[in-house]
Amino acid sequence: MTEELITPVYCTGVSAQVQKKRDKELGLGRHENAIKYLGQDYETLRARCLQSGVLFQDEAFPPVSHSLGFKELGPHSSKTYGIKWKRPTELMSNPQFIVDGATRTDICQGALGDCWLLAAIASLTLNETILHRVVPYGQSFQDGYAGIFHFQLWQFGEWVDVVIDDLLPTKDGKLVFVHSAQGNEFWSALLEKAYAKVNGSYEALSGGCTSEAFEDFTGGVTEWYDLQKAPSDLYQIILKALERGSLLGCSINISDIRDLEAITFKNLVRGHAYSVTGAKQVTYQGQRVNLIRMRNPWGEVEWKGPWSDSSYEWNKVDPYEREQLRVKMEDGEFWMSFRDFIREFTKLEICNLTPDALKSRTLRNWNTTFYEGTWRRGSTAGGCRNYPATFWVNPQFKIRLEEVDDADDYDNRESGCSFLLALMQKHRRRERRFGRDMETIGFAVYQVPRELAGQPVHLKRDFFLANASRAQSEHFINLREVSNRIRLPPGEYIVVPSTFEPNKEGDFLLRFFSEKKAGTQELDDQIQANLPDEKVLSEEEIDDNFKTLFSKLAGDDMEISVKELQTILNRIISKHKDLRTNGFSLESCRSMVNLMDRDGNGKLGLVEFNILWNRIRNYLTIFRKFDLDKSGSMSAYEMRMAIEAAGFKLNKKLHELIITRYSEPDLAVDFDNFVCCLVRLETMFRFFKLLDTDLDGVVTFDLFKWLQLTMFA
């Protein structure tokens, strides 16, 4: 029985987040049920084009200047002058999608600085199964050609099916960007276009890490090795990785931008991404030598040292072995000794597809879990541990380590539980055209003390002030992803992902990979309210001085209207020079009246005004307590603590909404907004409590009650 396909429903705002969660629970976003990117269905669009006889043109990524770029490749750039978008059928009489299978030589770099992407595409060709997860079968310029193609990419936890037309940027009749060595093969150029589409433009692909594309082609996770500190078994790690279909890339770091793509005297390119495509041991002068094979996406400029294409070392290798390993001259691919590799290159990236435990001698899969989260100014963007006043507001995740690694995994080291953490920031390439780029990100890991074990609560500031981290990312760095392999004793741990500085916004994906069974969960406070006692005083119980005050403030009807309440509160608050405030608005005063008005006449009598008066005095005490710097206003982070002190426990999303609604542009919250927020919260909680007659935390109401609640709360 075939699995039923889930069709996505397209929503906006908060409803979109709810719908997305439901879609995931139903399996949408798995590779076998990829999401139709931007709602475009390949089969439907292709059938429509074939029926109409019109070749497909993609309105979502049109053949215009802004699809090329925004600055270096922008509309008025000299680099885009003379570019024309043409289909392969316009460039030659017999274009091919793939000729005799996809190979590494199908990928030659053009005028775009996306060698990191092309190195990953070259590695992709080493594993046909993985290749055709990205490049679906059945595409051609002959049978059923309609000018439309599609590719499947992993994007931040879900697979998407990306539709493109085959209009490609050309200049003087030749492809401007990636092309095949043969010139008549177009799968790599079309894949590059699909990748440009999901990232917003071709220019957005300029500069990056090979691991980024590795992960988008596989959904795997990448580990980095500093070759200046290479582990003793790195060659075995590389052999295992290649055997298991992992994707590998390497590069030479630069310290000066002027060295970018500078060529060394042995013909290696600095700051340039290479694919690692093979590793082999050969017998040379009676000794076994470890070799490693690499490819330059340029399709030329090869290593000129030992074991290069024309080096004398090959003459002393067994002829059969030599023929098995020798590569063509100037095709961009070459061999070098592993010793030279360690000396010449500085960074190795391995994308583990499962991921497998590459450092273990036994083959096994890891348990994987991922969470999506956000950093929002004023609510969940607290910065790193250098900012103790706000660090605690970052999202928090718990991992429970239960089983230690097998004995042969840790040799003579202390036993522990291994896991890999990978923190990825989302959509940053798309945002480059708006002047935004990668934030500096990282994470810290804390052990949960025994007294807090098993409690799914968001840990507060005092905990982080009193406890040091047990592990952390090696660096805070402005890459799309940071990852670390960590080993800790069994127990519960809190992972805190963050940007380096506070108030840096972004969306992120946090992935856990554990070798043994491990439980994970996102920590958040449960929504609850400790509402003030609703005991109603009689007029006789109210202080005589307050009665005298009320009689002076109220009108002839001895009740206070919304307008009168506004006048009273603003007159009082203006006397408190230490408070930063714009005064109470008519709307906020109306909310207060709605909360306190027991008889429904839209005004406050003596008893009602007495309750409100005492409530505001209490709010003022709380406000002053949490205005830590005595600035007359609270910061958004102080507001979070003040709300809890007032009796309300809210989750991250609600804090986010409150800061959006009640803070000023500088994230300050003044007294009148603080009061309005607490009044609104109390009103909403009381409404819910009134409707929740069976106390199960769920209420059902009709449209009238919904409108009544939202219009007048």
Swiss-Prot record:
Chain positions covered by the region annotation Domain III: 355-525
What are the GO MF terms of this UniProt record? calcium ion binding; calcium-dependent cysteine-type endopeptidase activity
Q: Name one GO cellular component term.
A: mitochondrion
Check the record and name the SUPFAM superfamilies matching this protein. Calpain large subunit, middle domain (domain III) (SSF49758), Cysteine proteinases (SSF54001), EF-hand (SSF47473)
Top-level taxon of the source organism:
Eukaryota
Question: Catalyses which reaction?
Answer: Broad endopeptidase specificity
The UniProt entry, under Pfam families, shows: Calpain_III, EF-hand_8, Peptidase_C2
Q: Where is the EF-hand domain?
A: 540-575, 584-617, 614-649, 679-713
The annotated site for Cleavage falls at 15-16, 27-28
Q: Which residues bind Ca(2+) 4?
A: 627, 629, 631, 633, 638
Annotated active site residues, numbered on this chain, are 115, 272, 296
Q: One GO BP annotation here?
A: mammary gland involution
Can you tell me which residues bind Ca(2+) 2? 318, 323
Can you say where in the cell this protein is located? Cytoplasm; Cell membrane
Q: What does this protein do?
A: Calcium-regulated non-lysosomal thiol-protease which catalyzes limited proteolysis of substrates involved in cytoskeletal remodeling and signal transduction. Proteolytically cleaves CTBP1 at 'Asn-375', 'Gly-388' and 'His-410'. Cleaves and activates caspase-7 (CASP7).
- So what family is this one in? Belongs to the peptidase C2 family.
What is the protein name given in its UniProt record? Calpain-1 catalytic subunit
